[in-house]
Swiss-Prot record:
Belongs to the glutamyl-tRNA reductase family. Homodimer. NCBIfam families: PRK00676.1. It catalyses: (S)-4-amino-5-oxopentanoate + tRNA(Glu) + NADP(+) = L-glutamyl-tRNA(Glu) + NADPH + H(+). It comes from Chlamydia abortus (strain DSM 27085 / S26/3) (Chlamydophila abortus). One of its GO terms (molecular function) is NADP binding. During catalysis, the active site Cys acts as a nucleophile attacking the alpha-carbonyl group of tRNA-bound glutamate with the formation of a thioester intermediate between enzyme and glutamate, and the concomitant release of tRNA(Glu). The thioester intermediate is finally reduced by direct hydride transfer from NADPH, to form the product GSA. Pfam families: GlutR_N. Catalyzes the NADPH-dependent reduction of glutamyl-tRNA(Glu) to glutamate 1-semialdehyde (GSA). Keywords: NADP, Oxidoreductase, Porphyrin biosynthesis. Pathway: Porphyrin-containing compound metabolism; protoporphyrin-IX biosynthesis; 5-aminolevulinate from L-glutamyl-tRNA(Glu): step 1/2. This is Glutamyl-tRNA reductase. Gene3D superfamilies: Glutamyl-tRNA reductase, N-terminal domain. Substrate binds at T50, C51, H52, R53, S102, E107, T108, E109, Q113.
Length: 338
């Protein structure tokens, strides 16, 4: 039996490479016959896809060559993936879930992203005990870590990078800002800008929800309206938007566009002269420049997570050794600890 993870993050691959890896990993979700053949009848997987990482956590009872196959598929794209199995896999996910492996150390969004990835996977397909246990314990230990360890508020945030970028391009608090999607990142950016005095904040979401901002219906959305700044954060592609084109985006001179989606909402061979288009690679580079040695102050916290991972790994080994083979694969866990 093998339990492991293969993936890449902002450290190993640029945005273009991460997009290609995400498309390859999504093939496992799109083709159940292919994934069953790849992982075996008793195997399965969970995809963790965020702005800064693309990972596949897998379990297989029979195929011990899965790791090498995954590494080969990802490496063929020019990326340099990492891989962990067993205890190292536990330690990695625990560190990821705690936020200690994030671009901005200690950020909290990753806990929710891991939770949603797990819920999606167990809703879409049967998961074996190993993956249920791994993700339940990672979520529990990540939550415990945040409650027991005092983490200083990040000096550098994505919100601060956005604010500085708007200042750099001459935007003011009177400008009109459009947020596509009521996503977590858009909400954080809007909250930060609102605190800085920005008042013309408008959201456009597919969902009909009550929010503390002005809204525009999707049916009434026009990119030719005088929005000075547009934030794409809805996990949609360009084809999902009526009237979205390079021409419509460039219809407002000096417009600044942030594309937080990975894969990107749209890709441009070169940025037009009349508008400024910025993606997550730009955000990552700006954050890393400001942080310099970004993980220097977090090393002291890692033994805490390593100890928690070892404890849960030992529990997993004991439990899995007593589970009949007929119960290795289960569609519903007995206990969900979030």
């Amino acid at each position: 039996m093998v339990l492991g993870v293969v993936g890449i993050s902002y450290r190993e691959a640029a945005l273009k490479e991460r997009e290609a890896v995400i498309n390859i990993l999504k093939d496992f979700e799109a083709n159940s016959f292919f994934s069953q053949h790849f992982f075996g009848d008793d195997g399965s997987f969970v995809l963790l896809l965020t702005c800064h990482r693309a990972e596949i956590y897998y379990f297989s009872k029979s195929n011990r060559h899965i790791q090498s196959k995954l590494l080969s598929r990802i490496s063929s794209l020019g990326a340099r993936p990492y891989c962990y199995q067993g205890l190292a896999c536990f330690t990695h996910l625990f560190t990821v879930t705690s936020g200690m492996d994030s671009l901005i150390s200690g950020e909290t969004e990753i806990q929710g992203q891991v939770k949603r990835a797990y819920i999606k996977a167990k809703t879409d397909r049967d998961l074996p005990f190993a993956l249920h246990f791994l993700f339940q314990k990672a979520l529990k230990e990540g939550k415990d870590f945040r409650s027991q360890v005092s983490l200083s508020h990040p000096v550098v945030t994505i919100e601060s990078v956005v604010e500085e970028t708007l200042d750099l391009h001459g935007k003011s608090t009177k400008d009109k800002l459009l947020f596509i999607g009521y996503s977590e990142i858009n909400r954080k950016i809007a909250k930060g800008l609102s605190a800085k005095g920005y008042r013309n904040l408008i959201f456009c979401s597919r969902k009909n929800i009550s929010i503390p901002y002005d809204t525009v219906a999707r049916s009434q959305l026009s990119f030719r309206e005088p929005y000075d700044v547009i934030f794409f954060g809805s996990s949609e592609s360009a084809k999902d938007f009526s009237g979205l084109s390079l021409e419509s985006l460039a219809s407002i001179p000096s417009r600044v566009i942030f594309d937080f989606n990975v894969p990107r909402t749209f890709t441009l061979a070169e940025s037009p002269k009349d508008i400024i288009c910025l993606d997550m690679d730009f955000i990552s580079e700006r954050v890393q420049k400001k942080l310099q040695i970004s993980k220097q102050c977090t090393n002291k916290e890692k033994p805490f997570l390593a100890l928690a991972a070892r404890k849960q790994w030992e529990v997993y080994e004991k439990k899995s050794s007593h589970i009949p083979s007929s119960q290795v694969r289960a569609s519903r866990p007995k206990l969900l600890i979030l």
